[in-house]
Regions:
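N-terminal Rossmann-like NAD(P)+-binding subdomain of aldehyde/semialdehyde dehydrogenases
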Residues: 1-138
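Conserved small-residue-rich beta-alpha loop and adjacent elements
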Residues: 125-158
Length: 158
């Protein structure tokens, strides 16, 4: 296998290490050291995420869908290597990881289609009823708008 784990945190396009680390014993028994992010590194990652949010929020629905489909394409193109890395890191059988990979790419493509359809916007419009009693109803419009980056704490076991 040609993949060598970085053991670092990817922050704003750069692999960043800290002095604190932990060691994991993957299936091969060879120890791998992984960097533990400092509070400052987490802060820098949040700043980078905010900057990315600002620029990404200017992209079209088509561009966003294309990005998700491109990610799915890359995962599929690198499928064998991803499976090999996953089995060596976790000990899970290849069939399980291939299933997880298929689920992931399927969800990415589903989300891409959801974006293209515009369903996520959940636009609503309640027209004005000026003659409504006991009080008139104003023209009400609701549109979903992104507010910024989201931190996700997910499983890291594979």
């Amino acid at each position: 296998m040609s993949f060598i784990p970085q053991g670092a945190n990817l922050i704003n396009g750069n692999w960043v290490r800290s002095q604190d680390s932990f060691t994991s014993q993957p299936v091969s028994g060879a120890p791998q050291s992984f960097s533990v992010a400092t509070e400052e590194q987490v802060h820098q990652a949040c700043i980078a995420a905010e900057a990315a949010f600002v620029s990404f929020s200017q992209t079209s629905r088509q561009q966003r869908a294309e990005l998700l489909n491109a990610i799915a394409d890359e995962i599929e193109a690198r499928g064998d290597a991803i499976t090999e890395i996953g089995t060596s890191e976790t000990g899970l059988p290849a069939a399980r990881l291939q299933g997880e990979r298929g689920r992931t790419t399927g969800q990415l493509r589903l989300f891409a289609q959801h974006i293209l359809n515009g369903d996520y916007l959940d636009r609503r419009h309640d027209g004005a009823l000026p003659d409504r009693q006991p009080l008139p109803r104003p023209d009400l419009k609701m549109v979903q708008r992104p507010v910024g980056p989201v931190a996700v704490f997910g499983a890291s076991n594979f």
